[in-house]
């Protein structure tokens, strides 16, 4: 059995253009400012487990995420349908999604994509991706280091590299930060340049 956990935005969901528009509207930023602030956030997450976020700050983050989620859902976006098609070819697999985004825009898309995800854990469930990955692996009854993770951001690689097997963390070049930025934390054998590259992975089945 293969155990695959996916980030959503930029990996399964083609949300970048819509996200930039929403950030511009929510925060009054120019397109360039929205892109720059996004790259900074995707390089160093502001809500990892070790940051000890206060309840007050967490409440503000949740309110922001809800507003963002509603606007992104209204604005609309597509999935990376060709990647979804490649994932459907993988046999003997369990899949899950963890995201710092909102269930508001993620769940409606994934429910219709034809893939089965045992979990869709978002910011509403916990602010830390470490916590969410650990919960999924606990429910799957496997060690965390047995799961694979697919992301498009440096911050995810840094955050989850402390608890997961780094050899099972892969970057998706079609996502937010692209191959050049991902190459700062991943070697080329751990970057998927095309959707079909996922079939080049030599799965470790334990």
Q: How should each PLM-predicted stretch be described?
A:
Residues 78-82, 101-102, 124, 128, ...:
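Short beta->alpha linker loops
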Residues 130-160:
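Conserved Lys-Pro-Asp/Glu-containing loop-to-beta segment of HAD-superfamily phosphomonoesterases
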Residues 150-195:
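Acidic, Mg2+-coordinating phosphoryl-transfer loop and its flanking beta/alpha structural elements
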Residues 2-81:
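N-terminal helical cap/lid subdomain that shapes the substrate entry/recognition surface
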Residues 114-123, 182-205:
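Structural recognition of alpha->loop->beta junctions
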Residues 35-39, 115-129:
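A short, structured active-site edge motif that brings together acidic residues
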């Amino acid at each position: 059995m293969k155990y695959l956990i996916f980030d959503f935005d930029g990996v399964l969901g083609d949300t970048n253009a819509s996200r930039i528009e929403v950030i511009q509207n929510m925060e009054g930023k120019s397109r360039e400012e929205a892109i720059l602030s996004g790259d900074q956030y995707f390089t160093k997450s502001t809500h990892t487990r070790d940051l000890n976020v206060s309840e007050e700050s967490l409440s503000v983050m949740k309110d922001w995420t809800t507003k963002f989620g509603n606007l992104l859902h209204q604005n609309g976006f597509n999935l990376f349908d060709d990647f979804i098609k490649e994932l459907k070819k993988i046999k003997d697999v369990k899949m899950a999604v963890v995201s710092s985004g909102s269930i508001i825009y993620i769940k409606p898309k994934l429910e219709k994509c034809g893939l089965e995800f045992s979990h869709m854990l978002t910011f509403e469930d916990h602010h830390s991706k470490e916590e969410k990955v650990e919960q999924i692996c606990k429910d799957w009854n496997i060690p965390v280091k047995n799961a694979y993770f697919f992301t498009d951001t440096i911050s995810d690689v840094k955050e989850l590299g402390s608890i997961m097997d780094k050899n099972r963390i892969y970057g998706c070049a079609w996502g937010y930060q692209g191959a050049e930025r991902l190459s700062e934390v991943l070697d080329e054998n751990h970057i998927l340049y095309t959707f079909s590259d996922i079939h080049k992975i030599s799965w470790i089945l334990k």
